[in-house]
Amino acid sequence: MAIKDWPVGEGPREKLLNQGVKQLSDAELLAVLLRVGLKGLSAVELARTMINEFGGLRGLLAASQTQVCRLDGIGPVKFAQMQAAVELGTRISQENLQRGKILSDPDLTRDYLMRQLSDRAYEVFAILLLDSQHRVIQFVELFRGTINSASVYPREVVSLVLEKKAAAVIVCHNHPSGIAEPSTADRRITERLKQALQTIDVSLLDHMVVGDREIVSFAERGWID
């Protein structure tokens, strides 16, 4: 049944307006963007098919135009609409961070890092540079590839911190496997960075490891004194 034939108030758009956006499932949210489905397939059913095809919403939104447009009923316009929605969310998170809310709202930091790093097919090691009031100066991706204790160079981190005149930092990296649990190598890297930053009187506030759906905080686990 097409969405236009659903009882009044039951379509995803009406549900959003009447009950709020948080009441919609992933498929219903995507259906609002798609607007229409295919013959014999509603927009919600099409959205559900797309999500399943890529193993989840994250996989779908990280897929290339070529991959997405192979699906029946999906062309460049629908792909562009999805990408625009993702980018708007990313820019809002970045704008909020730039307003200095990072430490007063830990969830904002997690959301920003999740948007930045969770969909990468390779490891990225990055740093949030903060001023003396813990406002964000800049987010910088420093290293890419296989991140281990040998591939992250404390001297490069220190050089960047001095260049930007940062007073404190939060480092972060992703696990493409989707599992956020820190490794022994992650803990070694953190200790080396903490010691290097102490030599220039800069605080390492946290090391966050980003997975598919969660972020592990070293500070919350008591691993950063």
Swiss-Prot record:
Residue interval(s) of motif JAMM motif: 173-186
Keywords (A to Z) from UniProt: Hydrolase, Metal-binding, Metalloprotease, Protease, Zinc
GO biological process: proteolysis
Annotated InterPro entries: MPN (IPR037518), RadC_JAB (IPR025657), RuvA_2-like (IPR010994), UPF0758 (IPR001405), UPF0758_CS (IPR020891), UPF0758_N (IPR046778)
GO molecular function, one term: metal ion binding
Pfam families: RadC, UPF0758_N
Domain MPN, first and last residues per copy: 102-224
Chain segments annotated as transmembrane: none
Residues given in the record as Zn(2+) binding sites: 173, 175, 186
Keyword flag Protease: yes
Superkingdom assignment: Bacteria
PANTHER family found in the cross-reference section: DNA REPAIR PROTEIN RADC, UPF0758 PROTEIN YEES-RELATED
Family the UniProt entry places it in: Belongs to the UPF0758 family.
Full protein name: UPF0758 protein Shal_0429
Provenance organism: Shewanella halifaxensis (strain HAW-EB4)
